[in-house]
């Protein structure tokens, strides 16, 4: 008797490419360039076939139509290159399954034009879609407050119409984050970028952040934790490009996060940021600081003051210098803010970075470290990561008693390589 071998199952990306009805050439190009990356990352994080299929389908049907024209003309502030899409993977020392996440700024053909100079309409369209999806626990009350406080209104848009905004790095007003959960559901996060609002209203970034936190207090009272954060940032200086984040859940359960940055990338600055200038001291913070030093040494970040050019890095000869970034997470009823630091690895040798992360994962007891290097290489077939410096974007680090080390790695998330070409070569096309 002849036994026939069962044909291998079609991978979710290939199956969906045949199954879904992509409505335009733009969607088809974006799907090949970003959907394929999402597929590789989901597979590398050991998502099941069913989980991969569900999340890829969500991406194709809900997000992909809101990437707008290809190639894009509006540059998003969520990535150094201006790409409106960024993938990351979260690792937890306690052994929880890996979680793939999407950072996303919706775009359309009018983004950046006089009809929508600051790309506000697409975000509202996506919010409407999310409202209709019946996501468990989904709540947009904080979004409404953040949009009111942190984004420009019609009158302000008109006042800015003739303003010189330079490279436009602060044009983005809002963005979304999506955690692709193992049960097939998604968790949604929101982001607001108040820099433009500060410019037109004359309010400082400190005033802008304090105003929103105070207005949110009846819904989610984080005033005690914010007081510590604000005192530290008043002492050291609020970054003019700071931004804000929250969860789309019932407000009292939401985390509030204030993101800020510095051009100083030194161990002394990291330790200061971690403890808010010694304002937060306890055994958990001390243990986290030890792990933070371990990771800092393994990644081998260039140590010193960085010359930051506020512009996108989307060509071979554009500036790759990237600032230190961090956020302070605040929860209702908890007087102590939690620090998460984002190592600015964009601009560092990619293989050096991924080797350092792999070794760190092994040292903290996660077997993912053994296969990490090869998995990251699989995202970029045909590219020698020992010769590149821009495919790894950020490595973030936090530490709690519950999760242990909480580490996320962020990647350039398109098959396009914008850094193959110089600005002059691009202008001649």
Curated annotation (Swiss-Prot):
Pfam families (UniProt xref): Trp_DMAT
Catalysed conversion reaction: cyclo(L-Trp-L-Trp) + 2 dimethylallyl diphosphate = cyclo(N(8)-(alpha,alpha-dimethylallyl)-L-Trp-6a-(alpha,alpha-dimethylallyl)-L-Trp) + 2 diphosphate
A single MF term (Gene Ontology): prenyltransferase activity
GO biological process: alkaloid metabolic process
Amino-acid positions noted as binding dimethylallyl diphosphate in the UniProt annotation, renumbered to this chain: 101, 189, 191, 257, 259, 342, 406, 410
Deletion phenotype: Abolishes the production of okaramine B and leads to the accumulation of cyclo(L-Trp-L-Trp).
Keyword terms, alphabetized: Prenyltransferase, Transferase
Record-listed E.C. numbers: 2.5.1.-
Superkingdom: Eukaryota
Keyword Chloroplast among record annotations: no
Xref: CDD domains: PT-DMATS_CymD
Functional pathway: Alkaloid biosynthesis
General function of this protein: Prenyltransferase; part of the gene cluster that mediates the biosynthesis of okaramine B, a prenylated indole alkaloid that possesses an unusual octacyclic ring system, including a four-membered azetidine ring and an eight-membered azocine ring, and that exhibits insecticidal activity against silkworm larvae.
Assigned protein family: Belongs to the tryptophan dimethylallyltransferase family.
PANTHER family: INDOLE PRENYLTRANSFERASE TDIB-RELATED (PTHR40627), PRENYLTRANSFERASE ASQH2-RELATED (PTHR40627:SF3)
Protein name (Swiss-Prot/TrEMBL): Prenyltransferase okaC
Organism from which the protein derives: Penicillium ochrochloron
């Amino acid at each position: 008797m002849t036994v026939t071998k069962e044909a291998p199952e079609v991978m979710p990306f290939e199956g969906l490419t045949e199954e879904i009805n992509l409505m335009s050439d733009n969607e088809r190009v974006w799907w090949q360039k970003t959907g394929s990356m999402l597929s590789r990352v989901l597979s590398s994080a050991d998502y099941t076939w069913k989980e991969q299929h569900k999340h890829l389908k969500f991406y194709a049907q809900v997000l992909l139509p809101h990437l707008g024209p290809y190639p894009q003309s509006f540059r998003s502030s969520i990535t150094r290159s201006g790409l409106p899409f960024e993938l990351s993977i979260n690792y937890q020392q306690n052994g929880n399954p890996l979680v793939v996440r999407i950072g996303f700024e919706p775009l359309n053909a009018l983004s950046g034009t006089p009809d929508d100079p600051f790309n506000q309409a697409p975000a509202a369209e996506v919010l409407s879609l999310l409202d209709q999806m019946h996501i468990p626990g989904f709540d947009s009350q904080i979004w409404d407050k953040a949009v009111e406080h942190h984004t420009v209104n019609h009158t302000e848009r008109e006042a800015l119409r003739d303003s010189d905004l330079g490279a436009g790095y602060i044009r983005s007003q809002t963005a979304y984050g999506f955690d692709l959960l193992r049960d097939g559901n998604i968790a949604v996060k929101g982001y607001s970028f108040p820099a433009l609002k500060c410019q037109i209203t004359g309010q400082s970034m400190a005033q802008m952040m304090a105003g929103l936190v105070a207005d949110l207090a009846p819904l989610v009272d984080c005033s005690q934790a914010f007081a510590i954060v604000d005192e530290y940032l008043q002492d050291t200086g609020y970054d003019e490009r700071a931004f804000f984040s929250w969860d789309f859940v019932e407000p009292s359960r939401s985390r509030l996060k204030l993101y800020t940055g510095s051009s100083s990338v030194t161990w002394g600055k990291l330790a200061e940021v971690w403890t808010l200038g010694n304002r937060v001291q306890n055994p958990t913070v001390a243990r986290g600081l030890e792990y933070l030093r371990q990771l800092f040494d393994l990644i081998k970040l260039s140590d010193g003051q960085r010359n930051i050019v506020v512009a996108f890095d989307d060509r071979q000869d554009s500036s790759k210098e990237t600032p230190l970034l961090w956020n302070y997470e605040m929860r209702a009823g908890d007087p102590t803010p939690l620090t998460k630091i984002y190592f600015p690895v964009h601009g560092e040798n990619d293989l050096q970075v991924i080797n350092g992360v792999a070794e760190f994962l092994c040292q903290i007891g996660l077997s993912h470290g053994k296969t990490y290097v090869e998995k990251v290489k699989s995202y970029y077939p045909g590219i020698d990561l020992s010769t590149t410096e821009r495919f790894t974007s950020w490595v973030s680090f936090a530490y709690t008693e519950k999760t242990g080390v909480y580490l996320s790695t962020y990647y350039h998330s398109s098959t396009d390589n914008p850094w193959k070409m110089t600005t002059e070569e691009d202008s001649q096309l």
